[in-house]
Amino acid sequence: MIIVTGGAGFIGSNLVAGLEEAGCRDIVICDAMGEDDKWRNILKHEIRDIVHPNNIFVFLDEYADDIEMIFHLGAISDTTETDTDLVMHNNFSLSRELWRWCYEHKVRFLYASSYSTYGDGQSEVGFSDDDSPEMLAKLRPLNPYGWSKHLF
């Protein structure tokens, strides 16, 4: 089984499509469907289940032996969200818990970061793939979303 957090969003649903195209048929989406039209993004996909983020750890524990990999794209991605506690809890703390769960259960974990970690790109760093601690320390995210992705 492959789990895609944020799987009903634009990028996540396209990842699900790519996985299906590659022959994967045991896909679970973890996403908060809410009141918007995200359900339309997954309408054409044959997925095993949709799990709300509040229930993900119960689901993981129940199906631990079946899980091959987690693609972690789920996040509050609204760069105008001003509730920093909410963004940090969802994007940093829960990501860390999910990574720990994967580590403890020997499940592959792929984390999607964001260009927002760079900030405005005007520092001496610019946009770089250098992930050394020295270079990462120079990044200056501009909002809670970018900061939450940078910290992880």
For each predicted feature, which ranges?
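A short helix->loop->beta-strand "cap" motif at the edges of active sites that frequently abuts
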Residues: 24, 104-108
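Active-site "gating" loop of Rossmann-like NAD(P)-dependent oxidoreductase/epimerase domains
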Residues: 75-85, 114-143
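Glycine-rich phosphate-binding loop and adjoining beta1-alpha1-beta2 segment
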Residues: 28-56
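Active-site Tyr-X1-5-Lys
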Residues: 104, 139-152
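SDR active-site strand-loop-helix element
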Residues: 5, 30, 70-74, 109-115
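N-terminal Rossmann NAD(P)H-binding glycine-rich loop of SDR-like oxidoreductase domains
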Residues: 2-24
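NAD(P)H-binding glycine-rich loop region in Rossmannoid oxidoreductase-like domains
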Residues: 44, 53-90, 119
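Short alpha-helix in the Rossmann-fold core of NAD(P)-dependent oxidoreductases
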Residues: 90-95, 102, 110, 148-149
